[in-house]
A protein has these predicted regions:
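Core alpha/beta nucleotide-donor-binding catalytic domains of modification enzymes
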Residues: 1-172
Length: 172
């Protein structure tokens, strides 16, 4: 359960899932710091930044922004995740926040279960935990019971702009 008096860092990409979580957090009156990492891997990634920056400004929210321009040639997804999570933790410490909010949803959970089964991964649970810790910082995932389509619908109903990352449409 989230503490309504606490400050949280919320990871936002500009997609429907994170924009829905951001809007919901703002609607609930939570004190949030919007954290965005721009990897510059897509031609239009700066448009994601502009969207998130505009939302943060229009709602009087603080924005923590990291630009990443160099990578090693290894697994980009794993590297991006490490960069992102470390930045979120740094932001938690900078603002003395209580934890990190991420918009992982039911589709992500199903995908993770399928990957765990395909890899025969032994884990204490299947899917994604609603609460985990990264470098001692709590990571909350309040949208795990909601499908991405429903988060997009919420954005449409609430008039919250979002962007579709074309790389998420590719088969992995």
């Amino acid at each position: 359960k989230l503490d309504p008096q606490a400050t949280y860092v919320i990871g936002v990409s500009g997609g429907p899932d994170s924009m829905a979580l951001l809007h919901l957090a703002v609607s609930m009156g939570l004190d949030v710091i919007v954290a965005l990492v721009n990897y510059h891997k897509r031609v239009d990634s700066d448009l994601d930044y502009e969207l998130v920056k505009a939302y943060a400004k229009s709602h009087g929210l603080r924005l923590a922004y990291l630009e990443v321009n160099e990578y090693t040639k290894e697994n980009f997804q794993a590297q991006a995740r490490t960069i992102r999570y470390r930045f979120f933790v740094e932001t938690v410490h900078r603002y003395q926040a209580k934890g990190i909010l991420l918009a992982h949803h039911a589709d992500d959970c199903v995908e993770t279960i399928l990957m765990q089964k395909a890899r025969h991964t032994r884990v204490p649970y299947l899917g994604i935990a609603p609460l985990s810790y990264y470098q001692g910082v709590p990571v909350y995932r309040p949208c795990l019971g909601v499908f991405k389509e429903d988060l997009a619908h919420y954005c449409e109903v609430e008039g919250v702009a979002y962007r579709i990352d074309s790389s998420n449409l590719e088969n992995h």
